[in-house]
């Protein structure tokens, strides 16, 4: 019996540059796991970005050591996770008035093929599910595809 080798098919989905916004919440882990699955064993690179939102009453270039320390810790966690899964990683911190606009701008600047965002389970007043401000903004305004992965939760969405 002769066994022939099957011709290797090209991957259906390939990404070279994935932007992963890091918020420092449990939702980051969901986005990091998905990014590791997509980039493991490839030459692709993950760009982790933490955005420090600066209120309008402060200067945009104002220093906030506490926020920078939090960002460093969150980015360090993400970098360690992806490095452990053999994914190339680059990290960055941005200061902006709104995280959504900073994420969209960074994706354009880095020529991201994909944005992978973690999403926390949140309920707004009245019991409905709420995606917040950042995720909907990025989904509406990004030129790159946006994938959201909601973090696991014990809470169920029961709406009347």
Model-based region annotation:
Residues 33-36, 104, 136-137:
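Active-site phosphate/pyrophosphate- and oxyanion-stabilizing loops and adjacent acidic/basic residues
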Residues 31, 58-61, 102-104, 127-128, ...:
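Short, well-ordered secondary-structure micro-motifs
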Residues 27, 99, 123-125:
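Short glycine-rich, flexible loops that bind phosphorylated cofactors or substrates
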Residues 1-13, 83-115, 120, 153-160:
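Structural beta-alpha unit
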Residues 7-65, 81, 87, 141:
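Small/aliphatic-rich secondary-structure junction motif
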